[in-house]
């Protein structure tokens, strides 16, 4: 399977709690932090929910 490189580009300050939880579940804590996840439906759903806060690159 492909891997996705997910980077938190915008802060979660002032964002709804569900978006904060989604960002934390992806493993992101700080702005400009990058994590790598397998490309699957669950991860894609989380990315879609916070797409305005993160950038995604396929590896």
Swiss-Prot record:
Alphabetically list the UniProt keywords: Ribonucleoprotein, Ribosomal protein
Name of the protein in question: Large ribosomal subunit protein uL30
Q: Does the keyword Ribonucleoprotein apply?
A: yes
Task: Give the quaternary structure.
Answer: Part of the 50S ribosomal subunit.
Task: Give the Gene Ontology MF terms in alphabetical order.
Answer: structural constituent of ribosome
Q: Which organism is it from?
A: Bacillus licheniformis (strain ATCC 14580 / DSM 13 / JCM 2505 / CCUG 7422 / NBRC 12200 / NCIMB 9375 / NCTC 10341 / NRRL NRS-1264 / Gibson 46)
| A GO CC term assigned to this protein in UniProt | cytosolic large ribosomal subunit
Q: Name one Pfam family in it.
A: Ribosomal_L30
**Gene designation per UniProt:** rpmD
Query: Do you know which SUPFAM superfamilies this protein is assigned to?
Result: Ribosomal protein L30p/L7e
- In Gene Ontology terms, what is a biological process of this protein? translation
Read off the lineage from the record: Bacteria, Bacillati, Bacillota, Bacilli, Bacillales
**Family the UniProt entry places it in:** Belongs to the universal ribosomal protein uL30 family.
Listed PANTHER family: LARGE RIBOSOMAL SUBUNIT PROTEIN UL30M, MITOCHONDRIAL RIBOSOMAL PROTEIN L30
Instruction: Enumerate the InterPro entries for this protein.
Output: Ribo_uL30_ferredoxin-like_sf, Ribosomal_uL30_bac-type, Ribosomal_uL30_CS, Ribosomal_uL30_ferredoxin-like
